[in-house]
Every structure is written in C-alpha cells, then in structure tokens.
UniProtKB/Swiss-Prot annotation:
GO terms for cellular component: cytosol. One of its GO terms (molecular function) is thymidine phosphorylase activity. Its EC number is 2.4.2.4. GO terms for biological process: pyrimidine nucleobase metabolic process; pyrimidine nucleoside metabolic process. Gene3D superfamilies: 1.20.970.50, 2.40.40.20, Nucleoside phosphorylase/phosphoribosyltransferase catalytic domain, Pyrimidine nucleoside phosphorylase-like, C-terminal domain. Signal peptide: none annotated. InterPro entries: Glycosyl_Trfase_fam3, Glycosyl_Trfase_fam3_N_dom, Glycosyl_Trfase_fam3_N_dom_sf, Nuc_phospho_transferase, PYNP-like_C_sf, PYNP_C, Pyrmidine_PPase_CS, Thym_Pase_Put. It holds the Pfam family Glycos_transf_3. This is Putative thymidine phosphorylase.
Amino acid sequence: MTSADAPRPQLKIRLIHLDTGRENVAVMSRRSKALRPEVFSGFSRVEIRRNAKSVLATLLITDDDALVGPDELGLAEPAFRRFGEPAGTFVTVSPATPPDSLDAVRGKIQGRTLSAAEITAIVNDLTRYRYSDMEIAAFLIGAARFMTSDELLALVSAMASVGTQLRWDRPIVVDKHCIGGIPGNRTSMILVPIVAAHGLTIPKTSSRAITSPAGTADTMEVLARVDVSVAEMKEIVAACNGCLIWGGHVNLSPADDILISVERPLCLDTREQMVASIMSKKLAAGSTHLLVDLPVGPTAKVASALDAMRLRKLFEFVGDHFGIAVETITTDGRQPIGNGIGPVLEAQDVMAVLGNDPKAPADLREKSLRLAAHLLEYDPHLRGGAGYARARELLESGAALKQMQKIIDNQGPSTCHKDLGTLTAEVTAERDGVVSAIDCLQLNRLARTAGAPIDKGAGIRLFKKVGDRVEAGEPLYRIYAFDPAERELAVAAAKLACGYTVDDAQTFREQVM
C-alpha cells in the first residue's frame, strides 16, 4: 500500500472566529498528522468530508498550535456554517479534485465562446462553493473581455435557476431597479407604497450596501425588519400588495451575490455582467414588468447618453427573450437625490416625502413620483398618461404613507438604533459662488469613512445642491459619526477633496448653456 492509498487520519473540527467573506477557508497545523508536504500546501484546495457530507475549502497552514492543534482542522465561520457539523466532529481531509467546469473558464480566458451547458456548469459549481475567489476572478476577467448575446442569455438563465424562484398568482407583477452609484436616491421606498396603495403587486427585494453608504435594505431596516423568509414574504405581499425586504435572505440568484463579492474589489462592472446580475434576480423574482432607472452623470455608472442607449438595448434584448416587459428611463445622475446619505438620514428623507412634509427634499419627491407614474401605467385600467396624476394623488392624500405603515407593521419592527451620530463636523465653502458640480463617488466615500452603513446613524446631510448660491464659510454639508477616529478620518478626507465644485456665477451660467 502506498502512502497515497493509506487511510487518512481524522481531524477534529475547530471553529475559528474569522470572517472570510464568501470563501470557505480551512486551517491546518504544520505539525498535523494529516499534513503531507507532497500533497498539501498553503492555498491548495481541499475536500473536507464526514460520511456523505463534504465541503471544499482553501487551505491555510499555521505554526501556531494555539490557533489549531496537530489533531485539529480549523474552519473559518463561513465554512463551518456551510458544513453544518458541530465542533469536535471528526473529519477527513483530502486534496480536492478541480471542478470540470474550470476547463471552460480556461477556454473563456483564451477567447473561446462558451456553450449554455458550460456556463450552467460554471454557475452550478460557483453556488456549491467549489471555486476559490481566484478562480471566480479568472472567470470574471475572461467574461469581461467579451460576451456574446447567447452567452449572456445562458448566464442569466443559469443564475436565475440555481436559487429561489418566486411565482405569483397575479397577471401583473411590477418591479423597479436602479443601477446605483447615486447617493441617497431612495425612490423605491416611496414608489413601492404608492404602487401598492393603487393595487398593483410590487414585491421589492433589494440589496445591502457593498461599496455605497447605504442600500435600500439597509435604509428600510431602520424602519422595519427586512430579513424575512420566502413564506413570510408571500404573506406580506398578500396583505399589502408589496414589500421592501433584503433579497439576500430569500436567496434569489445566489450566484450573483458570489460574483459581486469578487467583482467589486476588481472594479469589474461591464454592461453584460450588470445586465446578467439584475435580470437574473428579476427573472427569479417572478417579475412581469420591470422599470430600470439609469442615472447619467460624470461620476455615475453611466457617463453619457450613448452609454445609456447601449445599456437600454441590452436590457430590452434580455427582457424580450425571457418574457419580461422592460422599460428603461434615464435620470439625472449629476448629484445626490435627497438630502441624506446613510441609512438613518435617508430613512428620514423617505418618511418626510411620504408624510408630505414641506421641508422634504423636492428632488426625491419628484423623481419618486415620476418613476411611480411609469409603474402605475402598467395597469390596463389606468388611462394612458394618467400615471403621474394618480401617483401624486396617492402621495398627497396620505394613502401612500398609510400603505408604508402597513408594510412596516407586516414586516415587523426594526431592532436598529435610529439615533444620528453624536459626533459632527460641517464642511464649508471656500469661496463665494454657485455650486457647479458634486462628486457622487467622493460623497459616498466620505459617508462610508464616517461609519455608514455599519453605523446606521453615520453619514452626511447635504445643505447645498447644484445651482445653489453659497458664501465663503457657509456649510455645504454636515458629517455624522459615532467613532472619534472615523469622524477625524472623514474630516481629513473632506479637507483633501470635499466633493463640491464652486464657481463664480458667470462660469456656472456658461457651463449650463
């Protein structure tokens, strides 16, 4: 019997309190009785098995016996959770066989067009956590070079099919999605209660922030519970015609969540990958009609009208193939929408609009009404062109606020702290003039530096928008934080680049013309 054929020594599982994102990581002692240098090395892939249950992980080697002993196998939190066995359970560890679908990834890198079967195999292996982050990155980079229309359709279909697939016993199920990048912009939390109050079905699932100071789910969580199950979601929609929940908890298109976790650090955001991400989730969600908000601006994800047109054609192409009526609308992406950036501040804006507060941000109110109007006109009983008037009626009558409260009551109370950060700092204008530009990316960075979205009361409140006159020393915005170090970091970053451009009135007029 060769050493390779000998029975493998068993190791006891030990939980290591280490958050490794979405990647499965195992840790083994260099003195482990199961470690053979000719087989195992750092960052190799291993299969951990107990009877018929197994999980693949990336292996790290340690010399610290206090972390993992010679008779133990450490599992970081994600791997421990997925394996689902208690600490102390005996397991075997063996070299992992690379997924067959990696051959297709190599082919894509070399410029080959993949078949639908190959793309399906890749997505299936992704969702079974058979790929390391490096292997996922290889697939993303290969796909970023080029993707045919058939490959795009195959990717959308495969991603939609591996998670939860919702079906609704209603002829029209509307949805709205913004491609993101604009601070504030919490239109979904206003248009969902408007549309639901009208009687259309709008089961809205949203994401948490990844690189922004707040996602819709983070902001809604200030007001209500968002981590509901599929069964609870269906009950909420039956009672309210709509919901505002975190999509990650109902497991729509889990492959997309995995891909996004690797895309963002690599700054990969191609049109095809963006469309595949959005459309796979809408297909899985059972949407029949989709409105896509495309903000256009110099620091938005879409920089020009030409880019917006190309993206529109791609959304419509995929929608036509899968039987989803897709409408895109280009909106102003030159500056934030609303006055708040950060979960609590954005929730305050939303409730001010729904409550018809005279001080509510007019830009957020108007954009929400405009988007809601498009969705309402999917109702065949509503006269064409009457959507805006109906949306305004539902908002001004208080029906939308009442519907929002009903949604909040059905989703359950929030357990989040709603206080604003107690440490503040105002960023002021350096000269007299007119605000001519606002850098959305920089304001997002500053709000995150201040602690958002982890600290829901951290962020930025804006006092000035593009076109507003300012005097030297007048506040442009206020930073909110809880942690003194985060406040100081945000203030220092704002001194280097505050995100505002102030020009004299004549220069501003020339730019506008």
